Amino acid sequence: MYIGELASLTGATPKAIRHYEKLGLLPVAKRKGNYRIYEEIDVQSVKMIRLAQAVGFSLSELYDLSALKYKNNRFPVEVAQQLIQKKNQQIIEQKKALNRLQEDLKQLEDEIIQTYITHKIPA
């Protein structure tokens, strides 16, 4: 399949796909003349790259996994699982921080009501 079809199947732009290749996240596509030719495995790879980005992984983090894959001739599942666990822990911490922020906003609102409405202090 050509890059346009890969793009439409994955939601990635052709420019993004070429960027993934340049970074080494995708193997360099075979060529037919001036056209890149992709395979079904590339569809899955691009979908995983996009999902990983959507959940907060940077392209450099993905590159590190990709480098290990090519170095060891197999995808580093254990390393990926560790990174996912770490990202999940970061999300848990972010949720806690957002909950604290929400509590602070409620406290601020309560203090404004207490000060300016209950005690009728001019604003």
Regions found by a protein language model. Give the residues of each.
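Arg/Lys-rich, alpha-helical DNA-contact motif
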Residues: Y2-E5, P27, E40-A123
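Short glycine/proline-centered loop/turn elements that form peptide/ligand docking sites
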Residues: L6, T13-A16
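The alpha-helix within a helix-turn-helix
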Residues: A7, E21
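Short, hydrophobic-biased segments on the C-terminal half of alpha helices
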Residues: I17-R18, I49
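Residue-level "edge-of-site" marker
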Residues: Y20, G33-N34, L65
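Beta-hairpin "wing" of winged helix-turn-helix
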Residues: L26-G33
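Minor-groove-contacting beta-hairpin "wing" of winged helix-turn-helix DNA-binding domains
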Residues: N34-E40
